[in-house]
């Protein structure tokens, strides 16, 4: 409604949980030029096992389908993420699943962190932080390196183009 009644006002979603980013929302974003073609989707992990332990409300496959819908409806949409390396019980395979998801999406940029307990959270109360810090740091470094590669690819696609931007404080 705001996009329609205020066509000169640029609008941007700040963050959306993947399960809340419906086809209806994507269709509205596609329809109105004053809605920024940018979506922040905090996936956290590319492993279904870890997503379940995190109590996330989506699976890897649902997330990938959402990405496919975004790319189909809004081809030049920027997509960013949150990713956590070394969540309790994360295996090498879980980490490889995360790197594989990153290769599938090729995010424009992301917010990447090594897991650390936050007092009062379910994870702090119920899950032992059993991934050693050196492994967390190594995995985080791999995630950051991959993101830098993807950011460079995505940024180069805009060379020579004029685009409308939203500058925030």
What are these regions (language model features)?
Residues 111-116:
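Internal alpha/beta loop-helix hairpins
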Residues 64, 68, 96, 137-144:
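Generic alpha-helical structural signal
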Residues 1-3, 23-37, 90-108, 130-138, ...:
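Short, electropositive alpha-helical surface patch
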Residues 125-169:
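Terminal RNA-binding accessory module
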Residues 48-53, 120-126:
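A short acidic, helix-capping loop that chelates divalent metal ions and anchors anionic groups
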């Amino acid at each position: 409604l705001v996009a329609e009644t205020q066509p000169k006002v640029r609008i941007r979603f700040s963050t959306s949980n993947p399960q809340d980013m419906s086809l209806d929302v994507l269709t509205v974003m596609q329809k109105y030029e004053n809605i920024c073609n940018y979506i922040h989707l905090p996936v956290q992990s590319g492993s279904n096992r870890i997503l379940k332990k995190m109590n996330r409300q989506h699976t890897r496959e649902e997330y990938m389908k959402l990405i496919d819908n975004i790319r189909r409806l809004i081809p030049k949409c920027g997509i960013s993420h949150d990713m956590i390396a070394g969540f309790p019980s994360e295996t090498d395979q879980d980490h490889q699943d995360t790197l594989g998801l990153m290769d599938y999406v090729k995010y424009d940029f992301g917010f990447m962190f090594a897991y650390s307990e936050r007092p009062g959270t379910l994870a702090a109360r119920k899950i032992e932080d059993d991934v050693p810090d050196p492994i967390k740091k190594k995995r985080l470094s791999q995630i950051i390196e991959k993101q830098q590669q993807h950011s460079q690819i995505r940024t180069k696609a805009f060379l020579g183009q004029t685009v409308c931007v939203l500058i925030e404080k």
